[in-house]
Design a protein with these regions (language model features):
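Glycine-rich NAD(P) Rossmann-fold beta1-alpha1 loop
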Residues: 129, 156-163, 221
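Glycine-rich beta-strand-centered segment in the early N-terminal region that forms part
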Residues: 24-39, 51-91
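NAD(P)H dinucleotide-binding glycine-rich loop of Rossmann-like/cofactor-binding domains
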Residues: 87-152
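Glycine-rich phosphate-binding loop and adjacent beta-alpha segment
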Residues: 223-280
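Adenosine-nucleotide cofactor-binding segment
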Residues: 154, 170-223
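Residue-level marker of beta-strand positions
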Residues: 82-83, 102, 237
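N-terminal Rossmann-like NAD(P) cofactor-binding module of classical short-chain dehydrogenase/reductase
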Residues: 85, 214-217, 239
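Short, glycine/polar-rich helix-capping loops at beta-to-alpha or helix-loop-helix junctions
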Residues: 99, 182-189, 247-253
């Protein structure tokens, strides 16, 4: 027996608590991992809410990522004692997740933790860090590079994905990073993370604004996505990976047909496994 957070649903409520469970409570997989760390994400918060839209079948062990040590394996790629991590693949959604002392998953979902990275560090990055790195990877695929020092806009600058994105961009050598925040108290935080400039977002109804930015890494969605798209330069590129501001995008077509901008969706759940390993 071991401890796990278990989410249960009644007719009008969702409840969760730490319970004693055994391996029969875990979803199927050919690798059993002793979980050492699991990060807490926005999606995990939704998973614990009634009508959160994340968990469909109850009871469920939440936790959309985890890192730990292989306890046992019938998969040739992994052996007892290996340090590994898992993000995405509906872990903590339809497959029992990381808020447990043990997790069991198919070996195809597992990424070996690089030798130079500790188990703890891998979950300091976690799903948020992986999504941030994946967004940067896509922007660089479409031309963003350190040599040209482009103007980069990042939303959700003090949130999980946005804060890590700014730190990674700054660490690898990008200098012209502008952060979007909603409150004045977030300005200094964003600057400490590596932002050169900080904007407090304001609503506007104009279909197109002066082009300022070459690339836009959006982590928030909805009206914030629109805010950045309208301010991209000719042939600017944007990625979007989050929907904390909402699911709707009431955009107009002008930035696309007059400036030839591109909007790329970022999915960190089912992304190709080879890309996962490259990112980590």
């Amino acid at each position: 027996m071991f401890n796990a957070v278990v989410v249960r649903k009644s007719a009008s409520n969702v409840s969760y608590k730490v319970e004693k469970v055994d391996e029969s409570h875990l979803s199927k997989g050919d690798v059993l991992v002793k979980v050492v760390y699991s990060s807490i994400n926005y999606k995990d918060m939704l998973a614990l809410q009634y009508k959160g839209g994340v968990i469909r079948d109850y009871p469920m062990i939440p936790g959309i990522d985890f890192a730990g040590i292989v306890e046992s394996s019938s998969n040739d790629k992994f052996k007892e004692g290996d340090n590994v991590l898992v993000t995405g693949y509906d872990v903590g959604v339809t497959h029992t997740g990381g808020f447990s002392e043990y997790a069991q998953v198919p070996g195809e979902w597992i990424v070996p933790i690089p030798q130079e990275m500790s188990i703890k560090e891998s979950m300091v990055y976690g799903t948020a860090g992986f999504t941030a790195a994946l967004s940067i990877f896509e922007l660089e695929k479409y031309g963003m590079n350190i040599k040209s020092q482009p103007e980069i806009l990042v939303s959700g600058a003090t949130g999980g994905v946005g804060s890590v994105a700014i730190q990674i961009l700054h660490k690898i050598g990008y200098e012209n990073i502008t952060a979007i925040v909603r409150k004045e108290k977030q300005i200094e935080i964003a600057k400490k993370l590596g932002a050169k400039q900080v904007i407090i977002i304001e609503d506007d109804n104009k279909p197109l604004k002066k082009g300022i930015f070459d690339y836009f890494l959006d982590t928030v969605g909805s009206n914030v996505t629109l805010y950045g798209l309208k301010r991209l330069n000719y042939q600017g590129v944007a990625t979007v990976c989050g929907n904390v501001a909402g699911n709707s995008l009431n955009a107009n077509i002008l930035p696309f047909i007059l400036r030839g901008i591109k909007l790329i969706g970022i999915d960190s759940v089912y992304v190709d496994h080879n890309i996962r390993e490259d990112i980590w």
